[in-house]
Amino acid sequence: MASTVSAYKEKMKELSVLSLICSCFYSQPHPNTIYQYGDMEVKQLDKRASGQSFEVILKSPSDLSPESPVLSSPPKRKDASLEELQKRLEAAEERRKTQEAQVLKQLAERREHEREVLHKALEENNNFSRLAEEKLNYKMELSKEIREAHLAALRERLREKELHAAEVRRNKEQREEMSG
């Protein structure tokens, strides 16, 4: 479109110069003078003291058929023989089978990858669970040992207090016997 507009502007410049030159040679232009420039047709409508008026008609691209190649249907092939058709069908079937095998292979690879990922996730989960259980068991054993040691210390102190209390009672009884 831009090229058409620029071509139009160029033609209009050429037309004004041409009109000026023609007006020098011919004082009166022919009525309904038609000028053709490539893809444009120019008709002179009016000539006045204030200027001239023109009608510019742009041809459609379909009218330019001699200059541009005509788009036609592709050249027809000669009739293919039965053997050629059979070969083409076999080749198409082979391509289809190859493509189907490739798709199945990709699906199998994807499933295998999913299986591997799932197996790895389960293995990591089992390892985590086992480590967490071992850590918990260790903490429980440690807590149990600390508790038993604390209870043993309490029992030892209680036994010592009882021994001390028994000694104090014996001493008191001996004093009472001696004094009384």
Curated annotation (Swiss-Prot):
This is Stathmin-3. The keyword Lipoprotein applies. N-terminal palmitoylation promotes specific anchoring to the cytosolic leaflet of Golgi membranes and subsequent vesicular trafficking along dendrites and axons. Neuronal Stathmins are substrates for palmitoyltransferases ZDHHC3, ZDHHC7 and ZDHHC15. A lipid is attached at residues 22, 24 (S-palmitoyl cysteine). Belongs to the stathmin family. Exhibits microtubule-destabilizing activity, which is antagonized by STAT3. Residues 60-81 are annotated as: Disordered. It is found in: Golgi apparatus; Cell projection, Growth cone; Cell projection, Axon; Cytoplasm, Cytosol. Its main location: Golgi. PANTHER family: STATHMIN (PTHR10104), STATHMIN-3 (PTHR10104:SF17). The lineage of its organism: Eukaryota, Metazoa, Chordata, Craniata, Vertebrata. PROSITE patterns: STATHMIN_1, STATHMIN_2, STATHMIN_3. InterPro entries: Stathmin_CS (IPR030514), Stathmin_fam (IPR000956), Stathmin_sf (IPR036002). Keywords: Cell projection, Coiled coil, Cytoplasm, Golgi apparatus, Lipoprotein, Palmitate, Phosphoprotein. GO terms for molecular function: protein domain specific binding. Residues 38-180 form the SLD domain. Gene3D superfamilies: 6.10.280.30. Residues 75-179 form a coiled coil. It comes from the Eukaryota. Residues 60-74 have a biased composition (Low complexity).
